[in-house]
Amino acid sequence: PWGTCHAVLAAKDLIDGPFAVINADDYYGPEAFRVMYDYLSTHEDGSYYDYCMVSYLLRNTVSENGSVARGVCVTEPDGTLHSVTERTRIETYENGVHFTEDGGASWTDLPGDTPVSMNLWGFGKSFLDEAEQRFAGWLTENLPKNPLKCEYFLPLVVTELIEEGKAKIQVLRSTDKWYGVTYREDKPLVVEAIARKTAEGQYPENLWA
């Protein structure tokens, strides 16, 4: 598919109600799914599209083995999303977490409790219609520029809907630690964490039994 939004559109004919979107190769923890379910099962579109996302504390998503890219969230006073800014080089250091936008010439600190997006979104079926309507225009503009690597990202459509006043995205919070394998060295830590949660009874030995 041409990016995350196009991947969601591929399932359009199979979706008939509110739905969540995740990265298939990430571990989000149980809290995120609880708050997502609670929101989607009690909210629906009214005068605006009523969507949500689950944010994580930055310190619970970084790697000790190198830099990561994260979507840094800014929220409105009512807890809805104002913007997501992609910071492509975030690193830990002895005093905390910081990012650079100029190849390391200068660094800016980020508080560990900064909310970041890990691509856990909750939408109503209306999102599919909006994304589909915008896809042809996006393809016409971007395919000639970068035919092999252009991507139709979910946050692109979300940002457009917010700017047009069509949607509000409630920013939900999870304090669980997020796990993903950004670097080869991350894998043993993830394997150990999942094994520990299984031993504690949080997950069964055989998920598919």
Region annotations inferred by a language model:
Residues 5, 29-30, 181:
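Loop/helix-junction capping segments adjacent to catalytic residues or to phosphate/diphosphate-binding pockets
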Residues 75-77, 84-209:
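Conserved alpha/beta core of the MobA/IspD/sugar-nucleotide pyrophosphorylase nucleotidyltransferase superfamily
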Residues 1-17:
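Short phosphate-binding loop-to-helix
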Residues 17-18, 50, 167:
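Short coil/turn segments at beta-strand junctions that form active-site/ligand-binding loops
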